[in-house]
Amino acid sequence: MLNIVLVEPEIPQNCGNIARTCAATGCRLHLIRPLGFDISEKAVRRAGLDYWHLVEVFDYDNLDDFFAKNDVKQMWCLSTKAPQSYAEARFEDGCYLFFGKETKGLPEDFLEAHRDQCVKIPMREAARSLNLSNAVAITVFEALRQLDFPGLTEYGKMKK
């Protein structure tokens, strides 16, 4: 099972969309405060639709609190500043995927401390970044692809 870690997310709709991705994929969602919204806000709930009961959500006061409560064996930090592509990463079951706040990304000192675990999603140079919920989905599905989509249904059934 993958772990999505949102460090100080600011936009409730992004959190709701990410929760829905977690519900569909079985990922755990970890939220690092401060949050830019109340988790019970209507916008968060609406974006997650009626999937919230399928999501394991954990919240923490800060990154120190998070690391004190979790045994992180593998982690990847997503950042536009990273030197390598997420496609070069080898994701393991149980890994933690860290994403920063929408306006600033992950803290610079955190990136420096985990330099070898920093990856980016390639994009055009003129674009600053992708939407947070899109970046999470792209990374999660690459990790799941590498793990052969554990616990997921790969094929649908047409009615006719």
Task: Mark where each language-model region is.
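Post-transcriptional modification and biogenesis factors for structured RNAs
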Residues: 1-160
